[in-house]
Amino acid sequence: HMEERYRLILSTVFNAIGLKVEVEKMIATGRIDMVVQTSRYIYVMELKLRNNGGKSAAVGQIADRQYLEPFKADRRQVIGLGIELDDEGKGLLDWGTAE
C-alpha cells in the first residue's frame, strides 16, 4: 500500500534525526497516521493519496476527528499537517495545516 511506504520513509527520516515518532497512534476518535515530537512542537500528520481525497481530505480528517485535542494540554505548540501524496510513488504533492 502506497501510504504505508510513505509513512515508513517519513518515520525513518524523523527517527534518524532524533525526533520522537509514533506511527498509527490510536486515540479515542480514531487512528492518527503519525505524531512527530520536537522540543517545541508536536506535529499531528495525516497522509492521504491524491486519489483518496488528498490534502483536503487529510486536513478535514484531522479537524473532524479532533486529532489535535489529546495534545492541547502540552506546553508545546500543536500543529496538524494534512499531507497529499502521489499515488504513483512520485512523492509529496501538497500539504496544509489543520487547526
For each predicted feature, which ranges?
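Metal-dependent nuclease catalytic cores in nucleic-acid-processing enzymes
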Residues: 11-19, 61-81
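Structural beta-strand/beta-sheet cores of well-ordered domains, especially the beta-sheet scaffolds
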Residues: 30-32, 43, 76, 81
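Short conserved micro-motifs at the rims of enzyme active sites and ligand-binding pockets
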Residues: 46, 56, 92-95
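Active-site-adjacent loop/helix micro-motif of nuclease/hydrolase catalytic cores
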Residues: 51-62
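Domain-level recognition of nuclease-like catalytic cores that cleave nucleotide substrates
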Residues: 70, 74-99
